[in-house]
Structure formats: structure tokens, C-alpha cells
A protein has these predicted regions:
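Surface-exposed binding/hinge segments that line
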Residues: 27, 31, 104, 117, ...
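Short helices/loops that flank or line small-molecule/ion binding pockets
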Residues: 114-116, 121, 242-253, 271, ...
Length: 536
């Protein structure tokens, strides 16, 4: 693998829009006690292992049970470079020119079974994340190409040695899925955590009913003194938005932490008044349509381009934004970032032309040229309504306007991931969502699967890799923007490896008695619930 992160400049995504419902409140004194009930908008996670999975269904269900080494500062979750220790004692100053990072691990941290968490557990967990043994999957191996070794010389010290200094290291280290597991268990069965839970976080695991609910109680041995405030939590899986909204309306649930569309927010506010609050943010997340290049006729760029030309993004996004969690037409970069394409730049690429009739005429011409008039195929989708199923229904309708007929196969989250990873699909609706806004890192999703394991296009493209590496090595923001346009144009227009659909907008509703939670541009961050409290 090439040196993916050498000299990477960590570029934030510009100003992140944040808003809350109602005026700012004075600082309140948190109260202890009570059980928080919240909704998880999915049927079930494919597994419980944070190292393996990339879905919110896993992190929303399991983050309260686990510790991490470092994280985005919980008091400042919109930041892209404000990091805080969790099981370490303080953020270290690197040595050897930024190539050695030495962390001191807290004393007194215990797993749920009462055994102490030591530096050996931290090192073992990170070794599995960075270089998993055969038969074990880590979804973020690519992020850690800069790491040479992770070692624990004693029970309180973990040392990361890097191949080269890079400002990408700390953001990668702060991944919210990077749970600390017990070394003894990893040594015995490295896949144990796919179906079991044993952590050292603010809550202790009590019960999991697959696809139904998961529960935890306050960890009395939690090392952040005074936390958590809650006695426990109960999370309910529900893939239908109507079920989740009804639960909040009837106060059977206090919150949903992923996001709802404006129409649902307006409905709740109208019906509940000051009994409901909402927080809003830009969302570092977008759906993509990914053709499986290993299946005909999707190995033909003419067919892939035709699918993109059929979709009227400029008129579709405003209409869908009222009923779905989508908002902004964009390319591969988070809108608002200095590296994002302007509207004029986007409209030069196929799939973004302002004249939809011209686009569709070209799409029909390409299909005829490729011998694919009347093309029929199956669109794989995830059984999550917001916004997956809305987006799937939309693009299927758009494709009929060029004579293409797709049927939608909707699978629960676990089987959907199995189909993606196994290549068992023609074309799929998927997403590119990240914990931090970092355009150069974020667009790695478009790289070939041999470089980025969570790419499901099943293609190889050395030129795309070379274009990406040119960005990685470019420190000048102006030149980097030019390189990003070249990467984007090649990926989305020249080769059409994927179709990027409108970026999402995040609205998180909560009963007004739920306090202590702050929104961020990522629905992965801030889900351990340690600071949440109930004002009742």
C-alpha cells in the first residue's frame, strides 16, 4: 500500500452550521438518576464489533459500554482538532520529530467483569484495528498506514511509533469506533466481540434482544468521577420513521440521535410545543449510487454515465429535502469546505448539467450505443428509511425517464452489508459518512477496494490512486483545490465510479427534559451518553 497519509494537511471543512430550537438556556445543574429511552433508526447492526463495522446502528447501540483512548472533546463536538483523553491521563507531546507518541493510561479503569484495564489491553485493541490477524476485519486499516508499531512497555504506557510524522494521526486515533477491548479475550477469540459486549465505559451491558432493543445500567466504577448522570438507558431499534415519531410523541422515547427530516421536526414541534427541542447541523454524510463494476453491463462507463445523467439533482434535492434528510447538491467534498466544488464547477460534470432534458437525451444515446436500451437491473438498498429508501425510490423513478427499469431489493442492515462485502448486487444505494470533516481523508471512500476496504465498486484504477496521492503530498491549499477538482472530475465524470447524491442535513429531536447532549456534524460522535441527564 502506498504511504497514504504522508505529509497530509488536516483541512477542516470550513464553518459548520449549527442551530438549536429556541433561545440559549443558562447553565443548568445536572441531575443524577433516571433511565433514558431512545430510538435507533435501524433494524439491527450486522455485528456488535466497533472495529469491524461502519454503521451507526453499531455505535448508537454499543458506544455507552466502551472506552476509547482519545476522542473529540465532548464539550466541543463540532471541532475537528480539539482532542481529549478518555483512558489516557493527558494528551502527549510527540517526540522524535512527531514520530513517537507516548500515552499514559489511567489507573483504576476496570472492565465490566471487574478486571483492570491496562496498557496491554489498549495496545492489543489498537493492534487489531491497525493490522488485524487473518480472518478478522478492521474497517479502518487504511487510516493507519502511517503507524509502524503499537507497544505497551508496561501496564501504564502505550507507545505508537509512526513511519513518518503526520497531522492525520490524532484525528484517526480519535475514531469513535476504536473501542478498547480486553486483551485476554482478543487472544482467545478475536471475533468474540462481534456477538458479545464487555467494556469499561460509562454503562454496563445488561441485555440485547437482536433487532429489538439493547440496555445498560450505570457503571459505578466509571473513571470520570460524577459520571454518568443516568441510572441506565434502553435503546429501541425501529427502522420505520413513523414508529420512531410516534414513540417520541407519546413519550415512550426521549430522543433519536441520528436525524429526522424537516417535515417530521415541524410535526413534532407543532404537536408538542415546548415539550420538544431540536438541534440542527450540517452533516458530513451523503448517499452514493455505486455500480458493481465486476458485473456487466456496469463495467461499461457509458452505462454508468447514463445512470447519472438521468438524475435531476438540482430540482430533486429541494423537493426531497422536506421529507428526507438531504439538502445540498455537491460533489465528493463536504459542501462549505474550501475544497468543495462550486455550483459552476459541478455543472461541468455529467450528472450535474443544468439542462436535464439535454442530460437525458445524452443518457439515452449512450445506452443505445452500448446496446443497453431498456436496461433492467436490481438496486440493492438498506432497510433504513431516512434517507436510503427515499433516495432509492427517487432514483428508480428518474431512471424510468431514460427507459431504464430497476427493481429495489431492500435488506436489513446486516444482510445488506454482507451483500456489499460479497459483491452480491448489480447497483447499490450506500453512503459516505465520516466522524470528522477532513476532505482528503473523506474522499478515500472512492479509492479502489484494494486500497480502501469499504469501497464496494469492485474496480481497480491506478490513475485514481495516483491522483489521490498527489493530494496527500500537496501542502498548498490553492494547489490542493486544483488537485481535488482533477480527482473529482476523473472519479465522477471520466470514469463514473459512483454517483454522489445530495448531502444530508441533520436535525436531532429530543424531549425537553433530556439535557447534556450536543449535536455534531457526525452521527457517530458523542454517543456514550455519559453527560446526558434527565430534568424531571
Amino acid at each position: 500500500m502506498f504511504r497514504l497519509f504522508e505529509r497530509l494537511t488536516w483541512l477542516a471543512g470550513g464553518v459548520l452550521a449549527m442551530a438549536g430550537a429556541g433561545p440559549a438556556m443558562a447553565q443548568e445543574t445536572p441531575k443524577h438518576g433516571g433511565t433514558l429511552t431512545y430510538m435507533i433508526p435501524a433494524d439491527a447492526p450486522p455485528s456488535l464489533d466497533g472495529h469491524r463495522e461502519t454503521t451507526f446502528a453499531t455505535v448508537h447501540a454499543t458506544a455507552p459500554f466502551y472506552s476509547v483512548l482519545i476522542r473529540i472533546n465532548p464539550a466541543n463536538p463540532t471541532a475537528t482538532n480539539d482532542f481529549a483523553c478518555d483512558v489516557c491521563t493527558e494528551m502527549p507531546v510527540p517526540t522524535e520529530g512527531g514520530k513517537t507518541w507516548t500515552f499514559t493510561i489511567r489507573d483504576g479503569v476496570r472492565f465490566q467483569d471487574g478486571t483492570p484495564l491496562t496498557a496491554f489491553d489498549v495496545a492489543a485493541s489498537w493492534q487489531e484495528l491497525i493490522a488485524p490477524r487473518p480472518g478478522v476485519t478492521s474497517a479502518r486499516v487504511t487510516y493507519f498506514a502511517m503507524v509502524e508499531s503499537v507497544k505497551a512497555p508496561d501496564v501504564r504506557t502505550v507507545v505508537f511509533r509512526l513511519k513518518f510524522p503526520t497531522s492525520a494521526f490524532l484525528p484517526a486515533l480519535a475514531d469513535p469506533y476504536a473501542y478498547i477491548y480486553k486483551k485476554e479475550i482478543l487472544d482467545r477469540d478475536p471475533r468474540w466481540y462481534e456477538t458479545h459486549i464487555l467494556g469499561s465505559g460509562p454503562f454496563r451491558f445488561t441485555e440485547y434482544e437482536t433487532g429489538q432493543s439493547i440496555s445498560g445500567v450505570r457503571n459505578p466504577d466509571y473513571y470520570h468521577k460524577g459520571l454518568p448522570y443516568l441510572d441506565g438507558f434502553h435503546a429501541i431499534f425501529a427502522d420505520k420513521q413513523s414508529v420512531r415519531i410516534d414513540a417520541m410523541r407519546a413519550d415512550r422515547a426521549a430522543a433519536e440521535f441520528r436525524g429526522i427530516p424537516p417535515a417530521a421536526r415541524d410535526q413534532l414541534v407543532k404537536e408538542l410545543g415546548d415539550k420538544i427541542t431540536t438541534q440542527s447541523s450540517d452533516w458530513n454524510c451523503t448517499n452514493m449510487i455505486t455500480p458493481n463494476h465486476s458485473r456487466k453491463p456496469f463495467d461499461d462507463v457509458r452505462v454508468r454515465r447514463a445512470l447519472g445523467l438521468a438524475i435531476d439533482q438540482w430540482n430533486g434535492a429541494p423537493a426531497l429535502s422536506r421529507i428526507a434528510n438531504i439538502k445540498t447538491v455537491g460533489g465528493v467534498v463536504f459542501p462549505g469546505s474550501p475544497l468543495a466544488a462550486t455550483k459552476e464547477e459541478l455543472q461541468k460534470m455529467s450528472g450535474y448539467w443544468p439542462d436535464i432534458e439535454k442530460s437525458r437525451a445524452e443518457a439515452r444515446r449512450l445506452l443505445k450505443e452500448a446496446g443497453q436500451e431498456g436496461l433492467k437491473f436490481e438496486l440493492l438498498n438498506r432497510n433504513v428509511d431516512q434517507p436510503y429508501k427515499y433516495v432509492g425510490t427517487w432514483v428508480i423513478d428518474e431512471w424510468t425517464k431514460i427507459g431504464v427499469h430497476a427493481t429495489q431489493r431492500v435488506l436489513p442492515t446486516g444482510p445488506w452489508y454482507d451483500a456489499l462485502r460479497g459483491g452480491n448486487f448489480d447497483v447499490t444505494v450506500e453512503a459516505n459518512c465520516q466522524g470528522l470533516v477532513n476532505p482528503v481523508l473523506d474522499v478515500g471512500k472512492l479509492l479502489p477496494r484494494s486500497v480502501y476496504t469499504e469501497n464496494y465498486g469492485f474496480f481497480e484504477d491506478q490513475k485514481l490512486v495516483d491522483l489521490y496521492q498527489a493530494m496527500v503530498f500537496e501542502p498548498d491549499p490553492t494547489k490542493l483545490r486544483v488537485l481535488m477538482r482533477a480527482f473529482e472530475t476523473y472519479a465522477l465524470d471520466t470514469q463514473v465510479h459512483a454517483l454522489v447524491l445530495p448531502w444530508w442535513a441533520r436535525i436531532v429531536p429530543a424531549r425537553s427534559y433530556m439535557k447534556g447532549w450536543k449535536i455534531s456534524p457526525s452521527h457517530y460522535v458523542g454517543q456514550d451518553l455519559a453527560t446526558v441527564w434527565l430534568d424531571r
